[in-house]
Curated annotation (Swiss-Prot):
Residues 74-83 have a biased composition (Basic residues). Phosphorylated by serine/threonine-protein kinase UL13. Tyrosine phosphorylated. GO terms for biological process: regulation of gene expression; symbiont-mediated suppression of host gene expression; symbiont-mediated suppression of host mRNA transcription via inhibition of RNA polymerase II activity. Its main location: host cell. Residues 41-68, 104-116 have a biased composition (Acidic residues). Belongs to the herpesviridae ICP22 family. This is Transcriptional regulator ICP22. The keyword Transcription regulation applies. InterPro entries: IE68.
Length: 420
């Protein structure tokens, strides 16, 4: 039998079974199942991808099954037997990535083999699910998890509508309650509170520029207020507001109401003094009071007024000391002029005689904090010797100055009185 060359039957084979070019890898339009928006487990996603790959593999094997049924060997088809001879079908070789790229036309206008829709899709980014898998909000369709803030029951409950303006009845009831509250708080003398306030004022004046003169002013002021009330000499409510520099404010209104309420409870025994001159020197408020000393020294400064006050206090102390020294000496002529029973001196003497001057703390009336230490018998006088006075002055620096009374100081040292 003559040898038959494979080239003689090659055209017949090609005409009988034309070679089909396999499409470029990745150009086939594939329909992938759309991934759900909600989060699923990784097992479900992997299973879907595996089923998709298997379906594509099965479709490729079905299409190529009719063309070549022989198994592949090393990526190439097995040789076919034709007319006692074997030959390789080079047209049916599997394509590689390089051949696929070369087979694709570089011309962008050439759309004979594939369309613009057949472009392989880009790899999608990994989806970040912000919803917790085990969160109870999953059934409510909440994308973000709950915040850590827990709402109180007060916020969840519906609020009642607030009235835009108070009713006239409510305003009337409120005014009645305020009037009752003011009437119940009636003024009563509080001696303990007065003593604490005076003690605090003395402490503040210790660090002043002129502590001695400022303390004397405070003592004289409280003494005059007491004697003024004892003699039933009173000021009008508006004059008190001017004196305390609170006229025209809320404090002034409360002060006037308190004074009028107390005056209505007691009988008035004297006409109110309404004339009160204003302070013409440096002032610390809208209106101030002038004492008898400052009326004639209205053009002087505060330092000159303080010096004049100290000189006046020193003169009174010197007079009292000289009187105490001459009490022991017998007087050649003794003329006693008794005071009338209703005079101011007799009334003050009777009241002072009823006071308990024991040194126990808390047993003294508030007047003792005012009268005590107003003068001292240890101050140098014209008849005192210099050496003796120097020793006594050094002794005075160790404690409070002696009071004008026979007993010791009722208050602790440096708590109430100023050191010299």
């Amino acid at each position: 039998m003559a040898d038959i060359s494979p080239g003689a039957f090659a055209p017949c084979v090609k005409a009988r079974r034309p070679a089909l070019r396999s499409p470029p890898l990745g150009t086939r339009k594939r329909k992938r199942p759309s991934r759900p928006l909600s989060s699923e487990s990784e097992v479900e996603s992997d299973t879907a991808l595996e089923s998709e790959v298997e379906s594509e593999t099965a479709s490729d094997s079905t299409e190529s099954g009719d063309q070549d049924e022989a198994p592949r060997i090393g990526g190439r088809r097995a040789p076919r037997r034709l007319g006692g001879r074997f030959f390789l079908d080079m047209s049916a070789e599997s394509t590689t990535g390089t051949e696929t790229d070369a087979s694709v036309s570089d011309d962008p206008d050439d759309t004979s083999d594939w369309s613009y829709d057949d472009i392989p899709p880009r790899p999608k980014r990994a989806r970040v699910n912000l919803r917790l898998t085990s969160s109870p909000d999953r059934r409510d369709g909440v994308i973000f998890p709950k915040m850590g803030r827990v709402r109180s029951t007060r916020e969840t409950q519906p609020r009642a509508p607030t009235p835009s303006a108070p009713s006239p009845n409510a305003m009337l009831r409120r005014s009645v309650r305020q009037a009752q509250r003011r009437s119940s708080a009636r003024w009563t003398p509080d001696l303990g509170y007065m003593r604490q306030c005076i003690n605090q004022l003395f402490r503040v004046l210790r660090v002043a520029r002129d502590p001695h003169g400022s303390a004397n002013r405070l003592r004289h002021l409280i003494r005059d207020c007491y004697l003024m009330g004892y003699c039933r000499a009173r000021l009008a409510p508006r004059t008190w507001c001017r004196l305390l520099q609170v006229s025209g404010g809320t404090w002034g209104m409360h002060l006037r109401n308190t004074i009028r309420e107390v005056e209505a409870r007691f009988d008035a025994t004297a006409e109110p003094v309404c004339k009160l001159p204003c302070l013409e020197t440096r002032r610390y408020g809208p209106e101030c009071d002038l004492s008898n000393l400052e009326i004639h020294l209205s053009a002087t400064s505060d330092d000159e007024i303080s010096d004049a006050t100290d000189l006046e206090a020193a003169g009174s102390d010197h007079t009292l000391a000289s009187q105490s020294d001459t009490e022991d000496a017998p007087s050649p002529v003794t003329l006693e002029t008794p005071e009338p029973r209703g005079s101011l001196a007799v009334r003050l003497e009777d009241e002072f005689g009823e006071f308990d001057w024991t040194p126990q703390e808390g047993s003294q009336p508030w007047l003792s904090a005012v009268v005590a230490d107003t003068s001292s018998v240890e101050r140098p006088g014209p008849s005192d010797s210099g050496a003796g006075r120097a020793a006594e002055d050094r002794k005075c620096l160790d404690g409070c100055r002696k009071m004008r009374f026979s007993t010791a100081c009722p208050y602790p040292c440096s708590d109430t009185f100023l050191r010299p």
